[in-house]
Structure formats: structure tokens, C-alpha cells
Amino acid sequence: MRALGAVVTLLLWGQLFAAELGNDAMDFEDDSCPKPPEIANGYVEHLVRYRCRQFYRLRTEGDGVYTLNDEKQWVNTAAGEKLPECEAVCGKPKHPVVQVQRIIGGSMDAKGSFPWQAKMISRHGLTTGATLISDQWLLTTAKNLFLNHSETASAKDIAPTLTLYVGKNQLVEIEKVVLHPNHSVVDIGLIKLKQRVLVTERVMPICLPSKDYVAPGRVGYLSGWGRNVNFRFTERFKYVMLPVADQDKCVVHYENSTVPEKKNFTSPVGVQPILNEHTFCVGLSRYQEDTCYGDAGSAFAIHDMEEDTWXAAGILSFDKSCAVAEYGVYVRATDLKDWVQETMAKK
């Protein structure tokens, strides 16, 4: 009673749910899963297929289909007994922001368009930004992490003083912070969460870039809370669309600064940003709406239309511009990718 090609497939939905077929894996005497009927000159082959929840994708060496062998082990032809994993999707917001007109400026209603945006509260209640890049790690600036700490503070000292929210005010616990080994020049730090967050339409990482998106004139988006032009903290989430600026003009604008940030009252904002090979500038003409204090650590998000994916071209480092200065300064994400991936893999 066997026939080649007659196959029964059990579809196991969810985030890697295991097959539970009772003591005898061949026994289908169950009301919810009746034993399949036999056919002439054929047989029933038992298969399971692993699939992932919405906003996750299957990572496996094979195709996710496992067959029960003679030793009653579930095996895949390519992966053997090694099970697949469900990894979080990045850069695929359910409600992406749409550029409906050629206007550079800000909006007060993001409608879940930037699910990677996190809000970080440092000591003494200062609000800054952070960017979700996986279901357990975020990027922010080293300056954000050191707010109200001395320069000698360690990562262990800093972590307990931070409060972090993702999604719609979802409080998450921080396990540790990791500073870039050259953070006085590369203004970046990583935050690891104690638990992985569930990825939803409201909480989703942004992708690290596979290419350089920062050609002058390229338009991207920055989101956050920050301050308005009156330097008051805002309670409403907002975003702004801005172009990548010409780097030479940005350097000239900030008095040719190539040293770490310092007080300089000839600068339009009274302080000099870090400008080096690891940074790029974003902005437009004077007196237009721009980012304000509190948005540092947020991603400059660019939509890759070929891949239909959003990637973080950079992380905002210098954010004291508001409407009085032309340019914000960002750390290039392409320069961070190797360090970020190595750090996440070993920690």
C-alpha cells in the first residue's frame, strides 16, 4: 500500500515550534490530526516545515523541511539535525513614511514609520535617542552615554543610570553598554538588552547598510523627540526629511574643525562638532527646521528602493543645530558595521 510522491506535510507555525507527535512519531491517532488514509501502492512520509512569525524570517542551511528518519530523528537534507532559527526582519516598516511632496521639513506624526526609534533617558532626566539594530542591541552616541558622567566613568557605571523605551513607551531593561574603542573620535556606543524584544510593526530594527548611501543630495529621514526651535523638549514623536550635505561646505561652515568637540564661540552654535573621515553632514539652508538637542543617537534612515529596505546611513552625533545652524553631523554606519557585528557576536 505505497505510492511514491504521496506526502503529508505538517506545517508548524510560529517562532520555531517543535513537533509533538506523542510517544510514537508515526502515530496520528488524534482528533486534531487524524491518521492520513493509505493509498494503493503508496506510503505516507512524515515531514515538518518550520516557519516564522510575522516580522521574522527563517535562517537555515536548508529549506526548513525535516523528515523523520528510521532512528526517529527529524533531519533536513542540507542541515542534518541542526534546527533553523527565526531572526528578526530589519528595515521593513509596515507603514513607511511616504514623500508625497518635494518639501524638506518636519512632521509631528510618524504613525509607526520609524519602529527602530528608541527613547533614552539619562541621569537627571535628559532625553536622547537610540536606534534598534537587532532584537537585542541598539546604537547610540558615546556622548549620550556619558551625559552627567565624568570622562573616567566606565561602561558598568553608566548602564544602571539609563532608562530606555522602545515602541510605544515599552520599557526595556539594559544588560550592558559597550563603548567604541576610539569613542572620542568615533562617537558611538552599543547597548545590549537583558531580553530580546518581540519584533512587531511598532518595534523593529533598522538594517545596517550594505552600501554607502551618503552621496550629497541624497534624502533621508531623522526621527525623535528632541527640542523645538525654542529649545523646549517635545512630548510628541516627530520626524524630518533632510538631504546629505556637501562635506567641504560643512567643514568650512564649522570653521574647519577636525578636532574633538570643544567650545568655540565663532561657530554658529558655540561649539565645534567632531568632523573626520568617519562622519558626514546633513542639512539645508539656514533657518529651516532641523534636528534639535535630544535627537542624537537616532538614525539617518534612507530607503533603498531597489531592495525596498530601510537602512541606517548614519547615527546623529552633533545635534545642537535646531534652526540656527545649517548642518547636523552623523557617524557613518558603514564605518561601524564590522565593529558592531563583532561586538554583538562575542558579547
UniProtKB/Swiss-Prot annotation:
Residues the record marks as carrying a glycan: N148, N182, N256, N264
Entries under InterPro entries matching the protein: Haptoglobin, Peptidase_S1_PA, Peptidase_S1_PA_chymotrypsin, Peptidase_S1A, Sushi/SCR/CCP_sf, Sushi_SCR_CCP_dom, Trypsin_dom
Signal peptide (UniProt feature, chain positions): 1-18
Gene3D superfamilies membership: Complement Module, domain 1, Trypsin-like serine proteases
Localization per Swiss-Prot or TrEMBL: Secreted
UniProt keyword Signal, yes or no: yes
Tissue: Expressed by the liver and secreted in plasma.
Pfam families: Trypsin
Ranges for domain Peptidase S1: 103-345
Keyword Metal-binding assigned: no
S-S pairs: C52-C86, C90-C207, C250-C281, C292-C322
Any one GO CC term of the record: blood microparticle
GO-annotated biological processes: acute-phase response; defense response to bacterium; immune system process
Gene Ontology MF, one: antioxidant activity
Keywords: Acute phase, Antibiotic, Antimicrobial, Antioxidant, Disulfide bond, Glycoprotein, Hemoglobin-binding, Immunity, Secreted, Serine protease homolog, Signal, Sushi
Taxonomic superkingdom: Eukaryota
Domain called Sushi: residue spans: 31-88
Region (Interaction with CD163): 259-264
Sequence similarity: Belongs to the peptidase S1 family.
Record remark: domains: The beta chain mediates most of the interactions with both subunits of hemoglobin, while the alpha chain forms the homodimeric interface.
Record's subunit section: Tetramer of two alpha and two beta chains; disulfide-linked. The hemoglobin/haptoglobin complex is composed of a haptoglobin dimer bound to two hemoglobin alpha-beta dimers. Interacts with CD163. Interacts with ERGIC3.
Cited function: As a result of hemolysis, hemoglobin is found to accumulate in the kidney and is secreted in the urine. Haptoglobin captures, and combines with free plasma hemoglobin to allow hepatic recycling of heme iron and to prevent kidney damage. Haptoglobin also acts as an antioxidant, has antibacterial activity and plays a role in modulating many aspects of the acute phase response. Hemoglobin/haptoglobin complexes are rapidly cleared by the macrophage CD163 scavenger receptor expressed on the surface of liver Kupfer cells through an endocytic lysosomal degradation pathway.
Record-given protein name: Haptoglobin
Taxonomic source organism: Mus saxicola
Source species taxonomy: Eukaryota, Metazoa, Chordata, Craniata, Vertebrata
Gene: Hp
